């Protein structure tokens, strides 16, 4: 028995190390690519002045040319403007699409990621045939088909402290369409150091928000958020979900603000934050705090005079991928391969699925008992009663005096670890073996059952 436990512990530790190694390899590849790009980034010359619109341009942009607020001079400004878009996902796609359609002269596209099928519900520049291609090349191709006169400059790399300032200085306006906190601080600081306005938006579930930082003496991102939030409190779209239309609404609002800045009209949301609630169909505008004299980036005596280690500052990685928690020891975890062996052996046990009901409706293992993590966190009496009954029923298949092991599973292996901690703290269960399944159901789909849905 002791030997078997050691094998399980070692296998769990190997799985954990493999996951860490995979993450490190990804970061190394991104860093090497960024290093290469920083060494061979071609100079981007300023767009030449434009004295008049061609006959084709007058026809193409005729509906906006007749707007007195824009007119010919505004269109000429757009034609010589350049915009850097950080992130070619749910926000960046509609933003870039409308900027290209409106005739902005140059669009810089920054994204290290590739197109995945799960992107297509909201990232409207990409298509099924382009799965696996770098997002910036997919987006650039779509934009060129829309408007061949717009220059698209793809940067297939992660934005890093080594490259950000150089890139930002090449463009007139910057749009932050990223989905992680370290990149938000990085883009903000680069814009402050380069003296560029920053149009920033975010979207999650049915909600979104947009503002403009560092414009006309207004606040920057650090004025509003001097310190990053605890990493464990941050939810991204992969974890929390998002309705594609919501990212479309916010991306279009970003495009509107960028166009007004580029045309010389000025933005609407410098110093204020627009909140969008799609479920209730409401927009709400709130005033942000003014520029802080003691701001570390844009204050009177700034301490951020160069770009820094933002992943270290924020305690999280600069990616929109789900971060893996390490809350349990190897002895408290089991791989999906080992769990499959246990399942096939017919050994009595209880599998507890702690995902929300909405995820269980997508897919589930038929033999699992479902109790959402939130019910365990609040010690819901009905849920604990259900768990107790399942344990008593399961024990009927064990030898007399033997305990019933409990295995906890979720989507990715994070919530299951939290659930194990809770179960271990319950007095009625403290004598039972409780382990989480490493990698959750997505690991099950990848390593055990290729027909199991991934979401």
Swiss-Prot record:
> What is this protein's function?
Plays a central role in 2-thiolation of mcm(5)S(2)U at tRNA wobble positions of cytosolic tRNA(Lys), tRNA(Glu) and tRNA(Gln). Also essential during biosynthesis of the molybdenum cofactor. Acts by mediating the C-terminal thiocarboxylation of sulfur carriers URM1 and MOCS2A. Its N-terminus first activates URM1 and MOCS2A as acyl-adenylates (-COAMP), then the persulfide sulfur on the catalytic cysteine is transferred to URM1 and MOCS2A to form thiocarboxylation (-COSH) of their C-terminus.
Q: Which residues carry this modification: Cysteine persulfide?
A: 410
Q: Which organism is it from?
A: Sus scrofa (Pig)
Name residues in a coiled coil: none
Q: Which reaction does it catalyse?
A: [molybdopterin-synthase sulfur-carrier protein]-C-terminal Gly-Gly + ATP + H(+) = [molybdopterin-synthase sulfur-carrier protein]-C-terminal Gly-Gly-AMP + diphosphate; [molybdopterin-synthase sulfur-carrier protein]-C-terminal Gly-Gly-AMP + S-sulfanyl-L-cysteinyl-[cysteine desulfurase] + AH2 = [molybdopterin-synthase sulfur-carrier protein]-C-terminal-Gly-aminoethanethioate + L-cysteinyl-[cysteine desulfurase] + A + AMP + 2 H(+)
The GO annotation for biological process reads:
Mo-molybdopterin cofactor biosynthetic process; protein urmylation; tRNA thio-modification; tRNA wobble position uridine thiolation; tRNA wobble uridine modification
| SUPFAM superfamilies, sorted | Activating enzymes of the ubiquitin-like proteins
Q: What do the Gene Ontology cellular component annotations say?
A: cytoplasm; cytosol
Q: Where in the cell is it found?
A: Cytoplasm, Cytosol
**Which cysteine residues pair off into disulfide bonds?**
314-322
Q: Which gene encodes it?
A: MOCS3
| Residue span(s) of domain Rhodanese | 345-453
* Superkingdom assignment: Eukaryota
UniProt-annotated binding residues for ATP = 90, 111, 118-122, 135, 179-180
* Record family assignment: In the N-terminal section; belongs to the HesA/MoeB/ThiF family. UBA4 subfamily.
Which stretches does the entry tag as region Interaction with NFS1? Answer: 156-236
EC number(s) recorded for this UniProt protein: 2.7.7.80, 2.8.1.11
Q: How is the cofactor bound?
A: Binds 1 zinc ion per subunit.
What pathway or pathways are given for this protein in its record?
tRNA modification; 5-methoxycarbonylmethyl-2-thiouridine-tRNA biosynthesis; Cofactor biosynthesis; molybdopterin biosynthesis
The cross-references to HAMAP family, in alphabetical order and at most eight, read: MOCS3_Uba4
Molecular function GO terms recorded: ATP binding; metal ion binding; molybdopterin-synthase adenylyltransferase activity; molybdopterin-synthase sulfurtransferase activity; nucleotidyltransferase activity; sulfurtransferase activity; thiosulfate-cyanide sulfurtransferase activity; URM1 activating enzyme activity
The entry's protein name is: Adenylyltransferase and sulfurtransferase MOCS3
Subunit description = Interacts with NFS1.
């Amino acid at each position: 028995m002791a030997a078997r436990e050691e094998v399980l512990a070692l296998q769990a530790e190997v799985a954990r190390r493999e996951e860490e190694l995979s993450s490190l390899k990804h970061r190394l590849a991104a860093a090497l690519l960024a290093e290469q790009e920083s060494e061979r980034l071609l100079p981007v010359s300023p767009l030449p002045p434009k004295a008049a619109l061609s006959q084709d341009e007058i026809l193409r942009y005729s509906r906006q040319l007749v707007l007195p607020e824009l007119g010919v001079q505004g269109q000429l400004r757009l034609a010589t403007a350049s915009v850097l878009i950080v992130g070619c996902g749910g926000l960046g796609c509609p933003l870039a699409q409308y900027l290209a359609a409106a005739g902005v002269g140059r669009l810089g596209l920054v994204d290290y990621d590739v197109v995945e099928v799960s992107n297509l519900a909201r990232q409207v520049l990409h298509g099924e045939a382009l799965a696996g291609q770098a997002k910036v090349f997919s987006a650039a191709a779509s934009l060129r088909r829309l408007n061949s006169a717009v220059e698209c400059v793809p940067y297939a790399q992660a934005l890093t402290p080594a490259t950000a300032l150089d890139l930002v200085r090449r463009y007139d306006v910057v749009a932050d369409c990223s989905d992680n906190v370290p990149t938000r601080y990085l883009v903000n600081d680069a814009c402050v150091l380069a003296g560029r306005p920053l149009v920033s938006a975010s979207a999650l579930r049915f909600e979104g928000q947009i503002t403009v930082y560092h414009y006309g003496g207004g606040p920057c991102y650090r004025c509003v958020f001097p310190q990053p939030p605890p990493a464990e409190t941050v939810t991204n779209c992969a974890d929390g979900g998002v309705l594609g239309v919501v990212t479309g609404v916010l991306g279009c609002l970003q495009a509107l603000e960028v166009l007004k800045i580029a045309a010389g009209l000025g933005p609407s949301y410098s110093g204020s934050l627009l909140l969008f609630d799609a479920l209730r169909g409401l927009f709400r505008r709130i005033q942000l705090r003014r520029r802080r004299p003691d701001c570390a980036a844009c204050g009177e005596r700034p301490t951020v005079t160069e770009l820094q280690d933002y992943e270290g500052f924020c305690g999280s990685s600069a990616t929109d991928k789900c971060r893996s928690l390490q809350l349990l020891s190897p002895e408290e975890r089991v791989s999906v391969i080992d769990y499959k062996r246990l399942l096939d052996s017919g050994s009595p046990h209880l599998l507890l699925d702690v995902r929300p009901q909405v995820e269980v409706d997508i897919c589930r293992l038929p033999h699992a008992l479902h109790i959402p993590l939130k019910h365990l966190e609040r010690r819901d009496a009905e849920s604990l009663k259900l768990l107790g009954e399942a344990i008593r029923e399961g024990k009927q298949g064990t030898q007399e005096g033997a305990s019933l092991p409990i295995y906890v599973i979720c989507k990715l292996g994070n919530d299951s670890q939290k659930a194990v901690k809770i179960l271990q703290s319950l007095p009625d269960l403290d004598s039972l073996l409780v382990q989480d399944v490493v990698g959750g159901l997505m690991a099950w789909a990848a390593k055990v059952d290729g027909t199991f849905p991934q979401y």
